[in-house]
A protein has these predicted regions:
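Domain-level recognition of nuclease-like catalytic cores that cleave nucleotide substrates
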Residues: 68-99
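Conserved beta-strand positions that form and line the central face of beta-propeller blades
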Residues: 2, 50, 90
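Short, charged, amphipathic alpha-helix that recurs within catalytic cores of restriction-modification
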Residues: 49-70, 74-77
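Acidic-basic catalytic patches of nuclease active cores, encompassing PD-(D/E)XK
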Residues: 1-12
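A structural micro-motif at secondary-structure boundaries
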Residues: 8, 15-17, 26-27
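Conserved catalytic cores of phosphodiester-cleaving nucleases, focusing on short active-site segments
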Residues: 20-24, 28-47, 51, 59
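Short beta-strand or tight-loop elements
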Residues: 16-20, 76
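Active-site donor-binding loop signature of nucleotide-sugar glycosyltransferases
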Residues: 9, 36-38, 93
């Protein structure tokens, strides 16, 4: 889905700083840290609801670790791809480092 929308995989899924499901790069150079969540259905709030504050902190930590390796860090954002059964929802800019 993301590759069809001109996103390119910028990196593998993990580093010493922690795990990020996908690190993609938009055509404009923005790095997109993507968390993919799956649930068989949307009971109990669905897949997107499982990205709580602790998970966001771990993703921000991993992204910070990744960005430190770059001479000039590009703009970045955090997206969530939530899969509930057959329904896929892409939440662009689902949260930011200030959350």
């Amino acid at each position: 889905m993301l590759v069809r929308r001109n996103y390119r995989v910028a990196r593998g899924p993990s580093s010493r700083g922690g795990e990020v499901d996908l690190v993609m790069r938009e055509r404009d150079g923005t790095l997109v840290f993507v968390e993919v969540r799956w649930r068989s259905d949307d009971r109990f709030g669905g897949a997107a609801a499982t990205v709580g504050s602790a998970k966001r902190r771990r993703l921000i930590f991993a992204a910070t670790h990744y960005l430190r390796r770059l001479a000039v860090p590009p703009p970045c954002r955090f997206d969530v791809v939530a899969v509930d059964g057959d329904h896929i929802e892409w939440l662009r800019a689902a949260f930011d480092a200030g959350d």
